[in-house]
Amino acid sequence: MKGIVIGVSLSGKTTVAKYFRSNTSISVSEMDEELTKLNNGKYPTDVEHKHKSLAPKVIKGFLNKKDVLFFTNTDYFSLDDLRKAKDKGFKIIQLELGLDELNKRNKNRVKNEGYDDLSKWLEGMILYQKKIRNAGVVDIVIDASLSVERISEEIQGVFVK
């Protein structure tokens, strides 16, 4: 299984990744974890360093893996990166959630979980999702408002076709 799951912040990527780790034998990796490893155990806060130096190293190493389901936020993979991934047999899976629901989740996280307010970035993330979908590199779009079990089934279904 070789897959890239791309979702906007707040779309449930980490929840789905945790579900896969707890309920399947599928090898799972997350961009944030890999960036943290490369940055001496601290999540990189310097956006330029993260995107220009660390993320390309993560992507290069990841594209050579034989069996992995890789969860990532938007904007790390360029269209060329995604095309290379497809050429190497990766399926590109997109988690989709509307702006209204993303804003609700954002408000809840800010108020109840102490997260930073991501509202100013959400529209740009949605545009990235549309761009890669319109470029034809996405194999399947999954409604991120479904249950984690259903999302897991949909993702796994991509690999049995």
Segments from the language model and where they lie:
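Conserved substrate/cofactor phosphate-moiety recognition/catalytic segment
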Residues: 18-63
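Conserved phosphate-donor/acceptor-positioning beta-strand/loop module used by diverse small-molecule
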Residues: 86-106
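Hydrophobic anchor at the beta1->P-loop junction of P-loop NTPases
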Residues: 5
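Walker A/P-loop
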Residues: 14
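P-loop (Walker A) phosphate-binding loop of NTP-binding proteins
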Residues: 8
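Glycine-rich phosphate-binding loop used to anchor ATP phosphates in small-molecule kinases
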Residues: 49-91
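Small-molecule kinase domains that catalyze NTP-dependent phosphoryl transfer to phosphate-bearing small molecules
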Residues: 112-154
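ATP-binding Walker
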Residues: 11
